[in-house]
Amino acid sequence: MPILFHMSTQEGYEYGIVDEPGLPMLEEALEKYPGLKFIGHSQPFWHEISQDAKPDLKSRMEWGRGPVREGGRLVCLMRNYKNLYADLSANSGGCAIMRDEKFGLQFLEEFQDRLMFGTDMVNTDMVFPLGEWLDRQYQEGKLSAQAYRKICFENAKKIFQL
């Protein structure tokens, strides 16, 4: 059974599992349980997409902005651990992808088999612009049909056996 987890930066600060900058505890879990699918989610998780991710508490709880620098810890973990998946549904995932269109599209294509919409909350008042962004990228031919289908519904159907 896969697990989708929300991440926090320190105990008592916010809900979720706690990890340090660079996600060393997540890596330890990925190594220890190679047959378990971990689905990452939330700001501290997506913050690590860029090589210039700052280690301070405030930065790790932000959505991130500006160009993504190659060599981010999250990208390294995704490349090294096939049991690491990622949830794009919240604005943390959306901002990580949309903040740098070229990088975001490359990331979506490279990891299309392990990206999906999943969430840890139900809130009809929040706006999540990534869905429309993905639709537009697909319609404009910037995102392949295969990646679009997998990310939008096929991966979730497969992983959760729907």
Where are the regions a protein language model picked out?
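Mid-to-C-terminal alpha-helical segments outside catalytic/metal-binding sites
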Residues: F111-M116, V122-L162
